[in-house]
Amino acid sequence: MANILILGAGSIGTAFSFPCSDKNNSVTIIGTHLENNFIDQINSKRIHPVLKCNVPKNVQFLKFNKLSETINKKADLIVVAVSSKGIEWASTELSKVLKINTPIIILTKGLAIHNNNYEVLAHKMERLFNKNGIKQTNISAVGGPCLAKGLANRVHTSVVFANSDIKIVNQIAQLVSTDYYHVFTSDDVVGVETCAAIKNIFSMALGASEGLCNSNVTKEIREKNYLNTAAALLQQSIIEMGTFTEKLRGK
């Protein structure tokens, strides 16, 4: 059993607490400085206002002012579940209280820009920690797809945990893998984060495959025969994700 601290009480942070809790870990969710009222709502009814489901009974929800105290009680794993815009804030706040080499895993998806180049969020957080005087960091990333409501309802979900030291993500995977939350591991942080960030662009194209298949045929034909186009778009999506990953020096 591990002590897992999740920073961010939103949909994905709370959903991630389900497999963590089901694996008999001690789980604490700390809301951000903007989520104090949100934490009160959850604690009053034990229902997440966005996910619309009961939260696990053994998951503790605390306000942001408890962050330092909770980490000092020994957090074995810190999970960052804030928005991509909140990564800088989270890095700053964690820098104030972080113990050396405490494992961190980021649920947040996205790419940042630094010095006119793309930067994956794990590398951004490492850079910000270094800037704030934390020289030794241990940051992993998560690639999906993983919709929060699906995970909170314990449907089969497959994800990838990535760290340049694969032993670290193998250990984290053992902590949270369940019979419905299936974790693969990779040492390609750039590749996993890049594909996780851009996959939704391609998923929109796949979702539009019926309309894109051929504008010169009837709607009935499109409805029955769009799968060729969907398959072609899927193939092109994989090619382009590979090209983008290579450009960012992933594997």
Predicted regions and their residues:
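Conserved hydrophobic residues forming the short capping helix/wall of the S-adenosyl-L-methionine
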Residues: 46, 125-129, 245
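Internal alpha-helical scaffold of NAD(P)-dependent oxidoreductase catalytic cores
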Residues: 97, 131-138, 156-251
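Rossmann-like NAD(P)(H) cofactor-binding subdomain of soluble oxidoreductases
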Residues: 57, 61-68, 72-154, 172
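Electropositive phosphate-/nucleotide-binding environments in soluble metabolic enzymes
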Residues: 10, 14, 32, 36, ...
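NAD(P)+-binding Rossmann beta1-loop-alpha1 motif at the extreme N-terminus of oxidoreductases
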Residues: 1-54, 59-63, 114
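Short beta-strand/turn micro-motifs composed of small residues
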Residues: 8, 30-31, 82, 108, ...
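Nucleotide donor/acceptor-binding cores
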Residues: 2-3, 102, 157
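Short, charged helix-to-loop "capping" segments that act as catalytic/coupling loops
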Residues: 31-39, 65-74, 110-118, 210-219, ...
